[in-house]
Amino acid sequence: FAQADLQPLATVKLNKSETITVKQLKTRASFIQKQYGMESLPIEQKQALLENLIAEKLITQAAAKEGLSVTDSQVDDAFLNTFSQQLGTRVSEAQLEDLIKKQTGKSLDEYIKEYSGMSKSEYKAYLKNQLIIQQYVFSKKQSEIQAVAATDEEIRNAYEMNKSTFVWNDMMKLFLVMVPKGSNDMAARALATDLRNKYKGDSKKSEEIKNSNENGTNYRAGDITVAKTAQQAQQLGWSIDKLNELFGKSAGYLSEVTETASDFQFYAVLKKYDAKMLSISDVVQPETTVTVYDYLKRNITSQKQSQYFTEAAQEISKSLDIPSNVERKKTGDALKKLLNWQ
């Protein structure tokens, strides 16, 4: 099998000679299977993936020929954004490594391999290529992509088709303070108590607490909107009973300092919002300016631009896919034989 993995499938030579092997295709296939929960891929889909890899190399080589590149820090940002979005908070690579180790007992590299089928370095190389492709295609089609936008009819039709999903649950605006336990539970409890006493003495001190240099290092403090849902309770590390108890409180209520598995925290109820169905002109979240109409316009525009971008990338790669730039080493039955792995 190791010998077969080294078999070359195609060579892209627009700017330099790069060979795509069976092993590289297997890695990409594994990535797709992990992303979509698939046990295996049919040969036709593997062939399509091979064509995608050829297209990617054509565009990245064309970009290199024109002097386009991305920095390691841009790649690292894209890498961390992938996980920060999942976690709901910005993390460094060291913090991510520590978090993964605590939650799964695995190293970051092991976790990424399980999650994507790629090693960390392979995953970063994949992200780097995607960033270069985005940059190159956008440089060629910027005005056309930016001109793509949702129409009023598309927005209103989308609202009518999804009207039942635009609702407010019962919600509250809270001032929430969380002090991580770290290695000293007593010190964390003492800090949480001090911050609560400061707020209790003068609720305007919340701005001082939020703007302190300690916020984000020794503790986390801020205003959040909490919905009366099981998912929200899980995100906060609260029981359903605690969340229901919260929604029984009135604006102005200040909780005691409570302990969770990872921190000490307290909250103050700032405002309450009743559940309701949203019209197309209502704001999506309390105390924001984005309406349902704005939200749909942005999402539909983004979807249309993404679709246009994909088509533009395919068009560009097709124009570059000529015999002098690509040599397909295996075709027909010979290719299918190499792709017949489970």
Task: Set out the residue ranges of the language-model regions.
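An exposure/low-complexity boundary signal
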Residues: 72-88, 228, 232, 322-342
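N-terminal targeting/tethering segments
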Residues: 2-125, 283-292, 304-307
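Short alpha-helical scaffold segments that flank and stabilize functional sites
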Residues: 65-66, 191, 195, 215
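Surface-exposed patches in mature extracellular/periplasmic domains of secreted proteins
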Residues: 39-43, 62-74, 168, 204-211, ...
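Ligand-binding pocket segment of bilobal, Venus flytrap-like solute-binding proteins
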Residues: 197-233
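Secretory-pathway/luminal and periplasmic proteins that interact with or process carbohydrate-rich
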Residues: 83-93, 165-169, 185, 216-224
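Short amphipathic alpha-helical surface patches that mediate protein-protein
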Residues: 80, 160, 211-214
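PPIase-associated folding chaperone regions across multiple families
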Residues: 4-6, 33-44, 106-201, 235-342
